[in-house]
Regions:
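Extended, well-folded interaction surfaces typified by the phenylalanyl-tRNA synthetase beta subunit core
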Residues: 1-20, 150, 203
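Predominant activation on well-ordered alpha-helical scaffold segments within soluble catalytic domains
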Residues: 2-10, 26, 58, 62
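A carboxyl-terminal module marker
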Residues: 22, 32-44, 50-204
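Short beta-strand micro-motifs enriched in acidic
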Residues: 28-30
Length: 204
């Protein structure tokens, strides 16, 4: 399904569409030992152009999963998928189950499709998301106090994953945290070599 999405992106790009947000729902075919095939459904997402980067694309996936009321979502860096940029790719988990992968398509792969701009795609198991979706929302009264938003930046070793930092923040908040979202990773002047500054937005 990734190949199909890249072909769609390439077609839009060749038509001089400067930006696009795309999706496709389809089946993939996995051979079985009995000679037949499993045909799970997958949701493919694709985007390129102004306003699209790793963090905004990740935010879109988080919004989708939140609207489906899928709980216990986490992201882990993925470095062994040759289709994606090794530093901008992550696996998506929910409840310990792998839902899929997303990230920036490797520039060499994008070039093979005639696209010379950054492409972001996601491959998510539609069947798994359907099974894990939440039930009908339960009414909750409006909170007595408005939500509080705070931004924090954490300086850490480059080997520390964003997922590990998010988990530490959630544990430290002890149930007070409603949302946590990554919005920047900085390396450069002011930050020691081998370190990075990771910025999060918190809603309490």
């Amino acid at each position: 399904i990734l190949t199909s999405m890249l072909e769609i992106v390439a077609r839009n790009y060749s038509y001089r569409n400067k930006a696009a947000r795309l999706y496709e729902l389809g089946k993939i075919y996995l051979p079985r030992e009995d000679g037949l095939a499993d045909e799970p459904k997958y949701l493919s997402l694709g985007a390129y152009g102004d306003g699209v980067d790793f963090f905004s694309f990740k935010g879109g996936i988080e919004t989708l999963l939140r609207e489906l009321r899928i709980a216990d979502v986490r992201f882990e860096a993925c470095t062994d998928n040759d289709s994606y940029h090794p530093g901008r790719c992550a696996n998506v988990y929910a409840g310990g189950k792998l839902l899929g992968v997303f990230g920036q398509i490797h520039p060499l792969v994008a070039a093979n499709y005639g696209v010379d701009t950054e492409i972001y795609t996601a491959e998510l198991s539609f069947d798994a998301m359907y099974e894990m979706r939440g039930g009908i929302p339960v009414y909750q009264p409006l909170p007595k106090f408005p939500a509080v938003t705070r931004d924090i930046a954490v300086v850490c070793d480059e080997t520390v994953t964003v997922g590990a930092l998010e988990e530490s923040i959630r544990r430290g908040a002890k149930g007070l945290l409603k949302e946590v979202s990554l919005f920047d990773i900085y390396r450069g002047p002011g930050v020691a070599p081998g370190k990075m500054s990771v910025a999060f937005s918190l809603v309490l």
